[in-house]
Amino acid sequence: MDVGRHPQITLLAYSEIEDISGYIGNFHIKVRKKVRYVDEVECTACDECVEVCPVVVPKEHQLGLAARKAIYIPFPQAVPAAYLIDIEACLGFNPIACGKCLEKCDKKCIDFDDQDKTIEFDVGSIIVATGMDVYDPTEFDEYGYTRFENVLTSMEFEILSGPGGVTTGEVIRPTDRKVPKSIGFIQCVGSRCESRGSPYCSNICCMNTIKDTLLLKEYYHDIDCKVFYIDIRAFGKGFEDFYRRSKALGVEYIRGIPGDIREDPKTKNLILTVENTTNGEIEEHELDMVVLSVGLVPRYDASTIQRLLTLSTTSDGFLMEVHPKLSPIDAPTSGVFFAGCCEAPKDIKDSVTQASGAAARALTILSQDKVKIQALTATVDEDLCKFCGICADVCPYGAITVDIKAKIPAKVIEAACKGCGTCA
């Protein structure tokens, strides 16, 4: 919200980047500001339009656990605090078959004839902070996520247990709406596995589960919590103490990942079969609810940013930095920097730290009149150039332009060229 109020920050909410061109110190950005059908300046979020809207659809922000109307604010504390219309769900568009929100709005903020807008501007540097997605457990469904109602993901449990969630913070079972007496947490769902999901550790899952167990024990003292894990990775400042507090409150940590989950057809309880690797025994645990601690994966549209900025990705799909130790914030494209989980899975603390570093790196460019570049750059012999465009296609930095139709020889943008020799 501070960003929305800052006089020197322009916030383009509900927008998508369509094109990026240029180079360090001289990037040109084209943004499509998607139509809201509601004037975000005039709208006061009075809620009267929502009251008369007859359409009810699942609420994306709460993963479908709650409902919203066709006219809605995407999530609490959204900036700007103005409504928008889901035109695919709305009944009042082309032709107007409903129009109740239009009639109810006294300030006449709603305009069904509104259109997308294209905004273009120039910037000196770019910080990529696109975030991440969470692993979809339906991919293999080995833990019965699509078959058993009492199997939830960690994201769904977060919504269920949060004060702003569908139950205002009360943890209940989906099947009978009762507070569970026992909950099991299965770690590394979609992480640390070559055959199912991703081979890497998602960094945040262990501590997120430990936090959930502490909250459960704080509000439900007699609840039985069991955590099934491969390894507990409590490596950060204060993390080990957090882990020990959880164990001291009676949370049981079982070293082993369940190989099978069954549901009791009468009670809807879940029966987990697991090999406890600390004693080598096969155990069965009957639980009221199971939470899948799902891992982090690259955003579904990460390839778009990769293409627009001519970036590379690692084998796991996250954006690749110049050097993991010496330049962990810099992208191979000069003037572009990374912040947060676009580069690798990380928690809030590490994301904030990297974002601060990215802001500082961007300021080093903006505070200078001229930018130092590498002396070694490619050159084009215009007499020999055949205007084929192959050099421009293979350049990993987008540093070469060529007009094939007009037969204009290739030109190297020295500010973007790294002298790698790929074009040669």
Report each predicted region and the residues it spans.
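Residues forming the flavin
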Residues: 1-424
